[in-house]
Amino acid sequence: MSAAVVTVRGLRRAFGAQQVLDALDLDIADGEFVAMLGLSGSGKSTLLRILAGLDHQADGSVVVPRSRAVVFQNPRLLPWRRALANVTFALADAGPDAPSRTARGRAALDEVGLADKADAWPLSLSGGEAQRVSLARALVREPDLLLLDEPFGALDALTRLKMYRLLHDLWARRHMAVLHVTHDVDEAILLADRVVVLSDGRVSLDRRVDLPFPRSRGDEGFDDLRRVLLAELGVREEVGHDRGR
């Protein structure tokens, strides 16, 4: 196992009387892809915001790499900037001169398959294209840790499948650590090295996904792991239920 790039110990975060994270411990190794599941209100997004440095009100110990980036469900593109300018905006505080920023931005757009959309306005992009620009904006920072907060939740099914393949290829090529927050059990199994479930502000289940890539629903071991994860989430799948395979 590689050295940990994320180490969380005894993390607590409350909002008023509501304890959202309660003495949570978590490690993520260098280059590891971890998917995080949990019911609404379980603390997934709160944890991600803390790791991203967007929430400084928690107690406990958090060690994260300096170079990290976040992709949210909403692409959050600036509508008055073209796609390339949205990507290079992430480098505004990084120090490189303008030509270098432009070259890195174009390379990031090319990496997500949008080299021809550099001059496009955000409102002219499809939902999938806008999310790929958002992903390029994260990648251009060359993060050691990529934090994903349900980035595919607003996309249609076919676009989600394309984004799964893109994300897996980027992760395999860049060898960065990934924490992927999702409500979709199948998505977690398809993408991750490891799946953790949050419940009552703590990790209630931590399971490695020992299935070879590429994965698909119906693979040997897929359904068994799916049932384990659903049970941990309090969902019992009905016998004979057809998921459209």
UniProtKB/Swiss-Prot annotation:
Coiled-coil annotated residue ranges, if any: none
Descriptive protein name: Aliphatic sulfonates import ATP-binding protein SsuB
Location of the protein in the cell: Cell membrane
Keywords tagged on the record: ATP-binding, Cell membrane, Membrane, Nucleotide-binding, Translocase, Transport
Gene, per the UniProt record: ssuB
Catalysed transformations (reactions): ATP + H2O + aliphatic sulfonate-[sulfonate-binding protein]Side 1 = ADP + phosphate + aliphatic sulfonateSide 2 + [sulfonate-binding protein]Side 1
InterPro entries with a match to the protein in the record: AAA+_ATPase, ABC_transporter-like_ATP-bd, ABC_transporter-like_CS, ABC_transporter_ATP-bind, P-loop_NTPase
Organism: Mycobacterium sp. (strain MCS)
Family (UniProt): Belongs to the ABC transporter superfamily. Aliphatic sulfonates importer (TC 3.A.1.17.2) family.
EC number(s) on file: 7.6.2.14
